[in-house]
């Protein structure tokens, strides 16, 4: 078979809808990156640095990430960056023999595994959304989003440690950490077979800049840096991340609003009789049977609203207050 035909058969693109609607499908931050901080980014850019292959990661960015992590056991040799958290995930699938994940989970795990031709194992979460017993070990990388995407619920520390104790490598995807406020990064003191992945896309309103970072043992970071592309995160993107961390209080205040809106929406949805998860992300998840879900999606299409459909239900991103009010009204009418 022609190699291009083989790729077309096994891999498929990540597609999004047009943005000519109320778009609550991709868990983007409803607030734009502050204009005064955009101005600061461009004031701090050195035009001469634009002509060179700029260091990635930038040592100053690594120092700021370490300060943000606020631990006493990590050094610059424990951190690297990626072109979004997605690149880190993609590279890790090249580093290990097999990728393991637990649907419902982040859809890109399967997309990336198929794209790179990786061996992968999907084992569904239990009915109560816990990590199942699974036969894994050295050579496997187990991807666990925490809070989970798309459901938003949180896995217990004991569940993570159960996988770590098998010897499999655990990629703990904390993309939504800021909306939960609790991290298992301290497990790095105990386990070398762990990497914590984070992103600037969600809480810091920088999805378009593509900046993620990974925290792990020095041995893992050394291996990751050998496999990832050189100069993988642009000078400009790294500057945006540095400025964001310099003004983190702005984003913490915005995150507080998003969390309050999430809790308001969860309360309203429960009162309407919807079955939802206890989401700790910047979204809510509503369980629905296929027929009901399809009817809701069609209803929302007539209102020019996009949410994300999954086999188990729908995920709704927390938007601006007026967007949240609107979606609640439509869900009440639909009910």
From Swiss-Prot:
GO terms for molecular function: histidinol-phosphate transaminase activity; pyridoxal phosphate binding. Its EC number is 2.6.1.9. The keyword Amino-acid biosynthesis applies. Its cofactor is pyridoxal 5'-phosphate. It catalyses: L-histidinol phosphate + 2-oxoglutarate = 3-(imidazol-4-yl)-2-oxopropyl phosphate + L-glutamate. It comes from the Bacteria. One of its GO terms (biological process) is L-histidine biosynthetic process. Pathway: Amino-acid biosynthesis; L-histidine biosynthesis; L-histidine from 5-phospho-alpha-D-ribose 1-diphosphate: step 7/9. The modification N6-(pyridoxal phosphate)lysine is found at residue 202. SUPFAM superfamilies: PLP-dependent transferases. Signal peptide: none annotated. Keywords: Amino-acid biosynthesis, Aminotransferase, Histidine biosynthesis, Pyridoxal phosphate, Transferase. Belongs to the class-II pyridoxal-phosphate-dependent aminotransferase family. Histidinol-phosphate aminotransferase subfamily. NCBIfam families: hisC. Homodimer. This is Histidinol-phosphate aminotransferase. The lineage of its organism: Bacteria, Thermotogati, Thermotogota, Thermotogae, Thermotogales. The gene is hisC.
């Amino acid at each position: 078979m022609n190699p291009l035909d083989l790729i077309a058969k096994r891999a498929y693109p990540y597609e999004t809808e047009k943005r000519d609607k109320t778009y609550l499908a991709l868990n983007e931050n409803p607030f734009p990156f502050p204009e005064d901080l955009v101005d600061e980014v461009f004031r701090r850019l050195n035009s001469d640095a634009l002509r060179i292959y700029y260091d990635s990661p930038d040592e100053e960015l690594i120092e700021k990430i370490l300060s943000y992590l606020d631990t006493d056991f990590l050094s610059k040799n424990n951190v690297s960056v990626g072109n979004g958290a997605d690149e880190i995930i993609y590279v890790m699938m090249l580093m290990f023999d097999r990728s393991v994940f637990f649907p419902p989970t982040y859809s890109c795990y399967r997309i990336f595994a198929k794209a790179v031709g990786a061996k992968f194992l999907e084992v569904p979460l239990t009915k109560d959304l816990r990590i199942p017993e699974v036969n894994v070990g050295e050579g496997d990388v187990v991807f666990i989003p925490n809070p989970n995407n798309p459901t938003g619920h949180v896995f217990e520390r004991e569940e993570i440690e159960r996988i770590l104790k098998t010897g499999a490598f655990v990629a703990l995807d904390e993309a939504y950490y800021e909306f939960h406020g609790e991290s298992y990064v301290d497990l790095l003191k105990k386990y070398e077979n762990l990497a914590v992945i984070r992103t600037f896309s969600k809480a810091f309103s920088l999805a378009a800049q593509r900046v993620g970072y990974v925290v792990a043992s020095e041995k893992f970071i050394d291996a990751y840096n050998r496999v990832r592309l050189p100069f993988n995160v642009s000078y400009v993107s790294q500057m945006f991340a540095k400025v964001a961390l310099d003004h983190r209080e702005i984003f913490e205040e915005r995150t507080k609003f998003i969390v309050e809106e999430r809790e308001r929406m969860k309360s309203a949805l429960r009162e309407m009789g919807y079955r939802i998860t206890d989401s700790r992300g910047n979204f809510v998840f509503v369980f629905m049977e296929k027929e009901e879900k399809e009817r809701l999606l069609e209803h929302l299409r007539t209102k020019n609203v996009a949410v994300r459909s999954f086999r188990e239900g729908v995920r709704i991103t927390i938007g601006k207050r007026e967007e949240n009010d609107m979606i609640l009204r439509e869900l009440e009418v639909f009910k």
